[in-house]
Amino acid sequence: MIEGFCTNTGKDVFIHALCNSVGGYVHQNDIQNIGQFEQGNWPHLDWNKWTDKPCVVVGTLRGTERIIWECQKRNHPFYYMDHAYFGATRYYKSKGPNGVLYRLIRSQMQLNYIVELEKEDYQRIKKFGKQEWKPFHKNGEHILLCPPTKAICRLYNLGDEQLWIDTQLTELQKYTDRNIIVRKKDTKVSLQKHLENCHAVVTHQSTAAIEAILAGVPSFCDNVSAANEVSESLYENIETPYYPDDDLIKQWVDSLLSVQFTGDEFKDGTAYHTATRLQT
């Protein structure tokens, strides 16, 4: 039914859980201790013959990006897993109130559209609690630019991080003279601190855009972003950002909640069947 691809990291627990839940096949990797930007190897995968089953990967490192690219080239379905949008648990073992949480996205890396939830979906996401967001403040001063990581630059063929930064700065400065703060992932300043007195956040597909919207800061992003439905994309509008209303934000938040699942939901088939139903 599906074929999962392991990378010999803690992430593999999600590959096994999802595949086992529907009788899928797990491709073991015959290379140990694969570096983040090195290639693993799945000896039972024939890259030429490929497969007629949807593929399953976690993240974009250790060769999983090759699976994603091949699926995209062939217009072949795949399932992508990564950190949850809300209440994310890190390092695959840490547990929050609902245990380990991960998201499951079909044939892309982010959920960039609003899905139509059914009664059972609203019931399931209640356990994540009510998500709060602040009203948009419209008197911010600086612009916060959040560049993609090296892995994301590679995945989307964006060049390197500095090239992306330079390109966005050049474009933004055509339309604004505001101070632009570049926030790299390794910064010691918290995102919430950077969002204080912020006019707008600019990202490619970083989940920082989600936190920005919830903090009352408008977002500019690429259409592959999970914040796509509540954001602007044209820099010419940087001085007049888009402010989505509460009804749209609620639909958007519920959509993101609907694609994240607990460890048990990955094991019992809920994750696979729900993601397939909502995202097909």
Where are these regions (language model features)?
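Short, solvent-exposed loop/turn segments at secondary-structure junctions
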Residues: 9-11, 60-63, 84-87, 148-152, ...
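Well-ordered, non-membrane alpha-helical segments in soluble/globular domains
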Residues: 11-22, 64-65, 159-172
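N-terminal pre-catalytic "stem/leader" segment of glycosyltransferase-like enzymes
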Residues: 1-55, 151-152, 272-280
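Leloir-type glycosyltransferase catalytic cores
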Residues: 92-140, 175, 229-280
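Extended catalytic core of nucleotide-activated donor transferases of GT-like folds
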Residues: 30, 35-93
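Structural motif
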Residues: 53-54, 142, 199-200
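Conserved catalytic-core segment of nucleotide-activated headgroup transferases in glycan assembly
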Residues: 133, 138-186
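Donor nucleotide-activated moiety binding/catalytic core segment of transferases
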Residues: 40-49, 170-173, 178-227
